[in-house]
From Swiss-Prot:
Function (record text): Might be involved in sporulation.
Known uses: Has shown promise in a 4-component vaccine with BHWA1_00430 (AC C0QY54), SecA (AC C0QZS7) and FlaAL (AC C0QWY9).
Gene Ontology cellular component annotations, sorted alphabetically: outer membrane-bounded periplasmic space
NCBIfam families attached to this UniProt entry: SpoIID_LytB
Pfam families attached to this UniProt entry: SpoIID
Lineage per the UniProt record: Bacteria, Pseudomonadati, Spirochaetota, Spirochaetia, Brachyspirales
One GO BP annotation of this record: sporulation resulting in formation of a cellular spore
Parts of the chain that traverse the membrane: none
InterPro entries per UniProt: Bact_Sporulation_Assoc, SpoIID/LytB, SpoIID/LytB_N
Protein name (Swiss-Prot/TrEMBL): Uncharacterized protein BHWA1_00569
Top-level taxon in the UniProt lineage: Bacteria
Amino acid sequence: MNSIYAFANQNIIRVQLTDVKAPYTINIKGPYKAYNYKYESEIISALTNETVMVVENRLGLKVNEVGVYKEGIVFETQDGFTLNGIEYYGSLMFIPYNDTMIVVNELNIEDYVKGVLPHEMSPDWPMEALKAQAVAARTYAMYHILKNANKLPFDVDNTTKYQVYNGKEKMNWSVEQAVDRTRYEIAVYKGKVIATYFSALCGGHTDSAENVFGVAVPYLGGVACPYCNAQIKPWTNALSYNELNNDLANYSVHATEKSSIGISTDPKSGKATNIKIDNNDITSRDFRTTLSPRLVPSLNFTIKKVDNGIIITGKGSGHGVGMCQWGAYGMAQVKKDYKEILKFYYNGVDIVDYNRVNKEFEPDVWGN
C-alpha cells in the first residue's frame, strides 16, 4: 500500500489506548471472533455475550488461561466491547510493537469523533460550536490516518498528543447530534486534508504555525479573534533565577539580577517569538515547553525582572494555532454557523463530504 490509504479504508481509524494496562477484562456484546494478529488464524468464535480474560506474560498473551499468543490477538466484534470497565465501539487489537504489546481500538471514524468530542469541548456548549469541533476532530483524525498509513500499527493515540479519546464515556445527545449533523464532513485546503489544530483560548489573536511550529502554513496564519474576549483572564507565574537557570540549563542560561532579558514579538499577533537572556536566544515555543505549559500557558506573555527572579504575565491558554475553542463558543453565541466558524479560523479551506467525493485524499504534510 502506498502512502495514500485506499478510499474504502479512509473511514477506519486505529487508536492506541495508552492508559489501558494488563490484566485485561473484556466484555463483548453479541457475536465476535478472536484470531491471531499475525497469522489471522481463528482462536475463538462465539455467538453470544461473553467475558474474556487476557493476561500478559513474558511469552505473550493468554486468553481465558488458554494458549500463549506472542503474535498478538484481534477481537473482531459487531456491537463493541467493554475493556477494563470502559465501553468502546469497534474491535480490539493486541499488537506486538517495539518489544511490548500495545492495545489498539479499531473503529469507524464517526464513532471515534463521538468519543473525542466530549473530552475536547463541553457537551453543554452551543450546537454550532460542537459541530465545528466535530469537523475539526474528524479532519484531524483523517489527516493522521492518511499520514501514518502503513507506517505504524496505529494512527493516533488517546492522549493530548493527538486528541483525547475514552470510548463512549461522556456520550450524550448533544455529542451524537453534533457528529451526526456533520457526518463525513472534513476541511481541505486545495483538495488536501489539513491538520486542524485547535486550542482552548487564543487570548485575542490566534497564532501562526510559523511562530509555533516553525513552518508557514497558509490556512494557519493567525487571525484577530474578538469572540473570546469575555473569557480572557490574565495569568501570572514567578520563577527564581535558580529555577530559571535549572530549567534552561540546556541553553547555557545563567541569569542573575544583572542579566538582560528581552522578548521579540510577532507584529501581527503580539505573541512572543523569541526570548533573549544575555547572549542566549531561545524561541518562545522552546521557552514555553521547557518551562512547561503550566507555568507558561500560552505564547501571549511578557517577562518582568524582579530582585530574585522573573514574573511571567500573559493571557490565553494553549498553543494558540487554528481554532480558538472559546472563540468558537463566542461565534456560536452570535449566530455564526459551524462552517463560518471553521472558515474564520482556517483561512481558505473548503468543507467537503469525504463520502461523496470519489477520490483518494492526501494529507497536507508540512513537516509537523
